[in-house]
Design a protein with these regions (language model features):
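A short, structure-level motif marking secondary-structure boundaries and short turns
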Residues: 18-20, 33, 54-55, 81-83, ...
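Structural core segment of the AMP-binding/adenylate-forming
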Residues: 1, 75-76, 103-151
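Flexible, non-catalytic linker and terminal segments flanking ANL/adenylate-forming cores
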Residues: 1-28
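Hydrophobic face of alpha-helices
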Residues: 31, 63-66, 139
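AMP-dependent adenylate-forming
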Residues: 7-15, 33-58
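Short, flexible loop segments at the rims of nucleotide/cofactor-binding pockets, characterized by
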Residues: 22-26, 61, 109-111
Length: 151
């Protein structure tokens, strides 16, 4: 794919090369834009975490994880428009959960990690997610609860 340099006059002109093939309409969805980014930057770093251990995923590696997660969500009964909650510290896993949910066609319900457990539980009851992604620190707390979706 031909690389188009960004200028002040045409900051989004590069999208014209994919319009009608990678996406239809004026603007791509986030999953469509991510696939375009994979084509443009495939082997470049996409997600990096430095502590406690350095983890870095390329765009291509991230897409592979995102597609696997989207397939798992679909096999778990998540369908277009279903809610999937995501709560956790900033990490590659959080980003993959967010993108995987979008790739599955579901609605992401991001929940602030800084909230107290009872506040999170109230949000989960209101959102009625089919699946709730939570990090290891809170897994035990929410895996035993009912009405919070599959944890």
């Amino acid at each position: 794919m031909k690389e188009t340099k960004l200028t002040k006059q045409t900051p989004w002109a590069f999208l014209d090369a994919w319009r009608g093939t990678a996406f239809n309409g004026e603007w791509p969805t986030l999953p469509e834009m991510f696939r375009i980014s994979v084509e443009r930057f495939g082997d470049r770093p996409c997600l990096t975490m430095f502590e406690p251990d350095r983890i870095s995923l390329t765009y291509r590696e991230t897409l592979e994880k995102v597609e696997k997660l989207a397939a798992w969500l679909h096999s778990s009964g998540v369908r277009k428009g279903d809610h999937v909650a995501v709560s956790g510290k900033n990490s590659p896993e959080w980003a993959v959960a967010y993108l995987g949910t979008l790739f599955a066609g579901a609605v992401v319900v991001p929940i602030d990690y800084a909230l107290h457990d009872d506040e999170i539980e109230n949000l989960l009851k209101a959102a009625e997610p089919k699946v709730f992604f939570v990090d290891e620190e809170r897994y035990e707390t929410f895996s035993a609860k009912k009405n919070v979706g599959k944890v």
